Design a protein with these regions (language model features):
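Charged, glycine-rich intrinsically disordered N-terminal tails and low-complexity linkers that flank
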Residues: 1-69
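Active-site metal-binding core of divalent-cation-utilizing nuclease and nuclease-like domains
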Residues: 46-82, 95-98, 131-134
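Non-catalytic, well-ordered alpha-helical scaffold segments
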Residues: 20, 100-104, 165
Length: 178
């Protein structure tokens, strides 16, 4: 998606970079992605936020956790022979598509840095693991989503709230329904 020229003219000088959690949020709720782009903090007392962090911290103990590289925050990284494997840990496969696009974003950005990797989605509570390889079609999807997010971030106001099945558990719910 092309970045809207009018929006770009009026944009602040420094846009925050698109990050993986923003891609995930955008798939679920564009308003949440906009709030994240403004560095508005979610409700830190949210039970689901705590549970997700706990699962991530306590699962896969032997693997290298939370590796930061430029604007990327990778949950797990390991080597399998000559291949770098980047994994994203999620509480549930209920948001599988959002998690898949988040991981695809990481693979896309790593490829742009000259780092070849493959991905794994990990759902420890379900004892599931899914492989992900960045192909041309998936790379185009990532580019399109990045463009949509940039256009969203350029907006002065967030999109109006739209109720979906994730609202009840969302740590940003107070910003929509209070």
């Amino acid at each position: 998606m092309e970045i809207d020229a009018k929006l770009q003219e009026t944009a602040p000088l420094h846009l925050p970079p698109v990050v993986g959690s923003m891609v995930n949020a955008y798939i679920i709720c564009p308003r949440k992605a906009w709030l994240m782009s403004r560095q508005i903090c979610p409700d830190e007392d949210n039970t689901h936020l705590h549970l997700g962090r706990l699962i991530q911290d306590q699962s896969y103990g032997r693997e290298r956790k939370e590796v930061r590289l430029e604007h990327l925050c990778l949950d797990l990284v390991r080597r399998e022979k000559e291949t770098l494997v980047v994994a994203e840990v999620k509480k549930s496969s209920r948001v599988r598509e959002a998690a898949r696009m988040q991981l695809a974003f990481y693979l896309y950005e790593l490829e742009r840095m000259g780092i070849e990797a493959r991905g794994e989605l990990l759902f420890p509570e379900e004892r599931r693991r899914e492989q992900l390889v960045l192909d041309e079609k998936l790379a185009r999807q990532v580019e399109e989503i990045k463009g949509c997010i940039v256009n969203l971030v350029l907006q002065e106001q967030p999109p109006p709230p739209q109720r979906n099945t994730f609202c009840n558990k969302c740590a940003y719910a107070e910003f929509c329904w209070a």
